[in-house]
Amino acid sequence: MPGIKVFGETVLRGSVRVSGAKNATTKLLVASLLSDQRTILKNVPNIEDVRQTVDLCRVLGAIVEWDQQAQVIEIHTPRILLSKVPPQFSCVNRIPILLLGALLRRCPYGIFVPILGGDAIGPRTLHFHLEGLKKLGAEIVISDEGYWASAPNGLVGAHITLPYPSVGATENLILASVGAQGRTIIKNAALEVEIIDLIVFLQKAGVEITTDNDKTIEIFGCQDFYSVEHSIIPDKIEAASFGMAAVVSQGRIFVEQARHEHMIPFLKVLRSIGGGFSVHENGIEFFYDKPLKGGVLLETDVHPGFITDWQQPFAVLLSQSEGCSVIHETVHENRLGYLKGLVKMGAHCDLFHECLSAKSCRYSTGNHPHSAVIHGPTPLQATDLVIPDLRAGFAYVMAALIAEGGASWIENTEMLDRGYTDWRGKLERLGAKVLARDSVSVYV
């Protein structure tokens, strides 16, 4: 299992350039499969999830040229060569499920996707995806091995109301609707900035697609596509991650390309606990300004709320903030397990099955903890940790950087490779001492 040694009591200073958004890039690669036209993507992050998606597209028939130094991918899929996704792709992440929507127009007699893997943050049901596809005319068969979708008579536009504004379901239904005849209206849709980026990409490709302020997306089926050149938006999760690392280490980091309009809920909560930042034309500077004050309710939500991927690193900030703070996780039902690692380091965290806010969420009757109380500030001690999922991984690295008592061993670091480009190099250039397992003797 890949691991690193992270030395504590470190102050991070300098600048870092945020990469293109993981959650936009992977979806745009899938969207390029809608047609046989050429697509050029710029600002592409060199991360494992993108590498896996590129490999998946190649297996399906895409011709891909990736200039990693220039951060540019050119992809062209003259025809689809495979209608069954190899299992090695589904066990890594959840991207393959989007092929059900993206490829039904080009493969009407069936697409098969094996059972999915990804982060250990809950089952994340596919019910919304599959029911929406059925309303468009798809035939769905579910087995122990995976999911089979077909549309031998073609897809037809429909009115779909999602029970919950699921990001993945919204993306899948947008892609399927592009290949349907007529008009599709999706109500209660997710409208995260990555979905808006997908919509802009599709508009460039010739798709008539619009949104409005009440979470409604209107799509007209498209038969004639254009070639597209598109620059991927900066990754708001990576930007916030380095911003939190600056504040918790009592340092100062300029995050180049960070866009404040994508991060307003995060910046609002960061300011409420005393975290410092200043917005510039080409990025955001984050810094430690004064002792952090807790006593906040951090409630995750879909856009335009505080996104769930910011929650885990923010818990490290709350562990160093004076007072009692509450986390209420409303998006994923199993996303607080990582707190055990922070408790091992000395953080004071209590888990609850109840909704610890005035608003009950969809997990209020569930039998799992989805609320937490964090008491701070508490000094953290270096220890051994195993990363359970991507964003918890960065939280553990943040905690290790400020820990007392030497260095922390952190294992399963390949999780970080999924979502952070050159994360180790970026941290080292900011002043961190981060060593791979085979080179630890340098600092011993």
Curated annotation (Swiss-Prot):
Pathway membership, UniProt: Cell wall biogenesis; peptidoglycan biosynthesis
GO molecular function, a single term: UDP-N-acetylglucosamine 1-carboxyvinyltransferase activity
Positions annotated to bind phosphoenolpyruvate: K22, N23
GO BP field: cell division; cell wall organization; peptidoglycan biosynthetic process; regulation of cell shape; UDP-N-acetylgalactosamine biosynthetic process
Keyword Cytoplasm (UniProt): yes
InterPro entries (alphabetical): Enolpyruvate_Tfrase_dom (IPR001986), Enolpyruvate_Tfrase_sf (IPR036968), MurA_subfamily (IPR050068), RNA3'P_cycl/enolpyr_Trfase_a/b (IPR013792), UDP_GlcNAc_COvinyl_MurA (IPR005750)
Protein family membership: Belongs to the EPSP synthase family. MurA subfamily.
Role: Cell wall formation. Adds enolpyruvyl to UDP-N-acetylglucosamine.
Protein name in UniProt: UDP-N-acetylglucosamine 1-carboxyvinyltransferase
